């Protein structure tokens, strides 16, 4: 496939990980492998972040699991998956063949479960450039408080996952006023970057049955509705810790949305819900960023990071 030569340098550095551009898929929106390969050359995307994987096979939540909203989507899939070892054996080879840069996302409900999931990834090939810790999971050892809502818990889980000896990213929840402090704690514990932010807590009720629509009752809201929340979360975290690489996610639908996150302080970007509407959206946003930078005579996209703080 012919590559388009760009006049703007989109190179993105996230700790020790270097990507050709800042755009990635968000975990849970592009499957476990090369599902998007029929729509684009996966090498053109900064990285593919696979759906979060548990140490063991996981069945997920009861249906219904998805519900559209006026400006987004509620989901309560419950992190259904084949288990990290099965993924590495059965799904990873095809994704490697696509020459994509891969980020494996893992989750657990105890520190030990995170450790076990990471252990299965210790011998993954170099195409797996980073491990994303989905810390927006209930901690069964702390009254179901989310790992990403506790400085102590995020510290423990990041330190435990370091057994994998690959760059770590911590995906955090926006549903806490302590987000900048928790991001700093994750960084000090060994995360080279933080992903901000996961879904916002939400719910929908069927007025005829008078019951919650989702099978698990509660869910996470994603899509354009949460973009202002995520942009502020990135802004606040960058303001407190400008040295910390941030990957912004939440409601990105176009290059202009992506630029908001970059100016707020994001170095990398993930696109999620928009992929369901347009599986080519990542490529379109990359092209849009390049064109915007050329129009504004921006030579390196990294020069824009945190620009709204100047």
Residue ranges of each PLM-predicted region?
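Glycine/Thr-rich beta-alpha phosphate-binding loop at enzyme active sites
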Residues: 73, 137-152, 182-244
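Glycine-rich beta-to-alpha transition loops that act as phosphate-gripper elements at the mouths
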Residues: 30, 105-108, 172-178, 244-256
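Catalytic cores of alpha/beta
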Residues: 34-39, 114-124, 176-189, 239-242, ...
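N-terminal capping/small domains of soluble enzymes
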Residues: 1-102, 107
């Amino acid at each position: 496939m012919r590559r388009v030569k760009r006049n703007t340098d989109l190179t993105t550095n996230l700790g020790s990980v270097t990507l050709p551009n800042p755009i990635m898929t968000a975990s849970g929106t592009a499957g476990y492998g090369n599902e998007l390969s029929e729509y684009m050359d996966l090498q053109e995307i900064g990285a593919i972040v696979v759906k979060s994987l548990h140490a063991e096979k996981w069945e997920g939540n009861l249906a219904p699991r998805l519900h559209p909203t006026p400006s987004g989507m509620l989901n309560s899939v419950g992190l259904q998956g084949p288990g990290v070892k099965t993924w590495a054996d059965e799904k990873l080879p095809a994704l490697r063949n696509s020459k994509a840069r891969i980020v494996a996302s893992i989750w657990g409900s105890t520190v030990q479960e995170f450790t076990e999931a990471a252990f299965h990834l210790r011998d993954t090939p170099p195409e797996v450039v980073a491990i994303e810790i989905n810390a927006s999971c209930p901690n069964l050892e702390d009254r179901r408080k989310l790992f990403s809502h506790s400085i102590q818990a995020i510290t423990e889980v990041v330190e435990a996952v370091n057994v994998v000896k690959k760059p770590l990213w911590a995906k955090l929840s926006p549903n806490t006023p302590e987000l900048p402090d928790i991001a700093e704690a994750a960084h000090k514990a060994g995360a080279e970057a933080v992903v901000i932010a996961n879904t916002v807590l939400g719910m929908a009720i069927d007025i005829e049955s008078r019951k919650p629509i989702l099978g698990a009752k509660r869910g996470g809201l994603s899509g354009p509705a949460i973009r202002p929340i995520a942009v502020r979360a990135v802004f606040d975290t960058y303001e407190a810790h400008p040295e910390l690489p941030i990957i912004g996610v939440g409601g990105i639908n176009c290059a202009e949305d992506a630029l908001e996150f970059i100016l707020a302080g994001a170095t990398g970007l993930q696109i999620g819900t928009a992929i369901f509407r347009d599986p080519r959206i990542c490529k379109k946003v990359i092209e849009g960023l390049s064109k915007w930078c050329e129009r504004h005579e921006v030579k390196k996209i990294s020069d824009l990071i945190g620009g709204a703080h100047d």
